[in-house]
Amino acid sequence: MIQKNAILDVADNSGARKVLCIGFLGGKKSATVGDVIVVSAKVAAPKGRVTKGKVYKAVIVRVKGPIRRLDGSIIRFSSNAVVLVNDQGDPLGTRVFGPVRKFPVGEFTKVMSLAVEVL
């Protein structure tokens, strides 16, 4: 579960390294895997597409807290991570690093296709 003012890792090659969660879409108080959030880039690579201080949308791909699946198994990751997306839901980067949690059918298919491992 991600709350406001959480510092998150960026799991793509858009140029950002760390982002700050500044809001949620849909009037929610917190977010989990698959939710779109509003972030501000805090640490960025000098020659990336993303500049420090600008506001972007991102989809959450990993959370530290346990996620229970329908079959009863529990999955958890070692870091909280996001992938930066545009208004249409397409990723800003061309690669996604690390494992990604599976999204519902029809949501963020391009993010899942770029990921190395989908759990």
From Swiss-Prot:
SUPFAM superfamilies: Ribosomal protein L14. One of its GO terms (molecular function) is large ribosomal subunit rRNA binding. This is Large ribosomal subunit protein uL14. Part of the 50S ribosomal subunit. Forms a cluster with proteins L3 and L19. In the 70S ribosome, L14 and L19 interact and together make contacts with the 16S rRNA in bridges B5 and B8. It holds the Pfam family Ribosomal_L14. InterPro entries: Ribosomal_uL14 (IPR000218), Ribosomal_uL14_bac-type (IPR005745), Ribosomal_uL14_CS (IPR019972), Ribosomal_uL14_sf (IPR036853). Belongs to the universal ribosomal protein uL14 family. Binds to 23S rRNA. Forms part of two intersubunit bridges in the 70S ribosome. Keywords: Ribonucleoprotein, Ribosomal protein, RNA-binding, rRNA-binding. GO terms for cellular component: cytosolic large ribosomal subunit. GO terms for biological process: translation. Coiled coil: none annotated.
